[in-house]
Amino acid sequence: TDAREIYEEGIRVPPLKIFKNDELQSDVLNLILHNSRMPTWNRSDFNALVAAMRTAEKRVIEMAERFGDDEYYSALDELLARNKRAMARLIKDTVPTKKQHFEDYICDDGLGMGPYRIKCSMWRDKDKVIFDFDGTDPQSISSINFYLNEEMFKMFCGVYMIMVFDPQIMFNDGFYDLMEVRIPEGTLLKPREPAALSCRTHALGRIFDVLGGLLGQGDPDFLAGAGFSDSPHFMYSGYDKNGEWYQLYSIGFGGIPGKPSGDGPDGHSL
């Protein structure tokens, strides 16, 4: 988009409770639905999410009643501890103490400005891995910025490392305190308010490429080419023969990058 501030990109809804004491807060839901072109679809999605959460709640209660609270919470703690132990070994085996560097670029922001550099350094300090984005370009006046939450980046790293190096590791957030993420304020990945953010997914794709470039340096067998990164978004809308508004939205994903074992598959999600 050509937005220069986040206020130009739509209504900002802060975290709100849609249910309080198991009672739906209709005014909150209606506020969201009234800002949607397809409120019926969105209400259906919302109802599906609520049904899934109620099922999960029921299953947790069943486990706690069957095994007792102490056993249930002890099991949760053990799952977190098991993940942390496995990730600690993985970090020690795959991340060197010497700094590794990798950078990639967003070629253009859609308004003719760019390229924008995303740079990251990675190294191990005792049992902790450090990711430092110092050297990343300053925030843009366009909407290409991506406010990267440090905890979210840890999740990205954990999924990547487990899937690439040891898929047998059970995934949860037990390893989070084994990672430290440093993102300088005022950069493309931590812009100051009121920076526009609506085209942030272009930076997200580059972050995965940077992560792959960093981890692949330590083990060339897992080094892969760059991914497709940018995704075209297709919107189809209009009025059907009954005069009802319709809207279809599709994201076109590209191919998976090649690696030492062979070529990656072509476009896989069109």
Q: Could you tell me what each predicted segment is?
A:
Residues 1-270:
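Glycine/proline-enriched, intrinsically flexible loops and inter-domain linkers
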